[in-house]
């Protein structure tokens, strides 16, 4: 089963901003009904793009610094953080959507299909995990 990581105010930079892979971040809260609908879609992304794209969850109530830093005003917010820098040398600006989106819409919104692991990478990761 693919791993979904949980980021805190203290671990967000390492898990997301300094990651060498693209990261889909689910900003959520325990009391948020629509956030519960998003969880299975995050599991699908984590499984389908395992090894190529990381999935991270952030509880906005428990981690207010992250929410404020990225101006998260509504939840669920799903954000996509691309590694590296743009042509000007600045980090890519994260893309985000508010509300539930099925896997197919998230793939299109964030152009995720370009990050699918190559079959050789998948096989070597499965072999090294065994």
Name what the model sees in each region.
Residues 32-35, 78:
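The canonical Cys-X-X-Cys-His
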Residues 74, 80-123:
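Non-catalytic, surface beta->alpha helical segment in thiol-disulfide oxidoreductase systems
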Residues 20, 28-31, 74:
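Short pre-active-site segment immediately N-terminal to redox-active cysteine/selenocysteine motifs
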Residues 58-67:
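Structural microenvironment flanking redox-active thiols in thiol-disulfide oxidoreductases
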Residues 24-25, 55, 78:
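Hydrophobic beta-strand anchors of alpha/beta hydrolase catalytic cores
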Residues 34-49:
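Typically the conserved alpha-helix immediately C-terminal to a functionally engaged Cys/Sec
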Residues 4-23:
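A short beta-strand-turn-helix
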Residues 8, 28, 54-56:
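Conserved Rossmann-like nucleotide-binding pocket used by diverse enzymes
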């Amino acid at each position: 089963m693919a791993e979904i990581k949980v980021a805190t105010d203290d671990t967000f930079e390492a898990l997301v901003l300094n990651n060498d892979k693209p990261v889909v971040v689910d900003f959520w809260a325990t009391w948020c009904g629509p956030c519960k609908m998003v969880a299975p879609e995050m599991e699908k992304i984590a499984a389908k793009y395992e090894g190529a794209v990381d999935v991270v969850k952030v509880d906005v109530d428990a981690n207010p610094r992250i929410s404020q830093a990225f101006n998260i005003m509504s939840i669920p917010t799903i954000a996509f953080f691309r590694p590296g820098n743009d042509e000007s040398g600045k980090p890519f600006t994260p893309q985000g959507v508010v509300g539930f989106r099925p896997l197919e819409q998230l793939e299109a919104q964030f152009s995720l299909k370009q990050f699918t692991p190559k079959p050789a990478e998948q096989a070597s990761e499965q072999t090294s995990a065994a």
